[in-house]
Regions:
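DNA major-groove recognition helix of helix-turn-helix/homeodomain DNA-binding modules
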Residues: 56-71
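Short alpha-helical DNA-recognition segment
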Residues: 25-45
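Phosphate-coordinating loops and pocket residues in cytosolic domains that bind phosphorylated ligands
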Residues: 45, 74-75
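Short alpha-helical elements of helix-turn-helix
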Residues: 15, 40, 55-58
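The alpha-helix within a helix-turn-helix
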Residues: 21, 32-33, 62
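A short, Lys/Arg-rich alpha-helix, primarily the initiator
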Residues: 1-23
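Residues within the helices of the helix-turn-helix
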Residues: 18, 29, 59
Length: 76
């Protein structure tokens, strides 16, 4: 079997999420509201690579940004 473990590049993923949000002309608050989050703080945390979105939020982000879920992530 030819298997190589995928590793999530959290910093590059956080930059990608920030870029997508800005290109969509969404504020942290607007994106948090679309995702029905209690606070926009979590968006800041994602964009600083302190935390990563869970699967449900990744799915909803993919709908908001009109892309495949796996394309939101930067894998090395």
């Amino acid at each position: 079997m030819n298997y190589q473990k995928a590793v999530l590049d959290k910093k590059a993923t956080s930059i990608k999420l920030r870029t997508l949000r800005i290109e969509a002309r969404l504020t942290h608050e607007m994106l948090a509201e679309l995702l029905q989050l209690n606070s926009s703080r979590v968006i800041y945390d994602w964009e600083c690579a302190k935390k990563m979105p869970n699967v449900e939020n990744l799915y909803n982000l993919s709908l908001i940004f009109n892309m495949k879920m796996e394309d939101l992530l930067v894998i090395r």
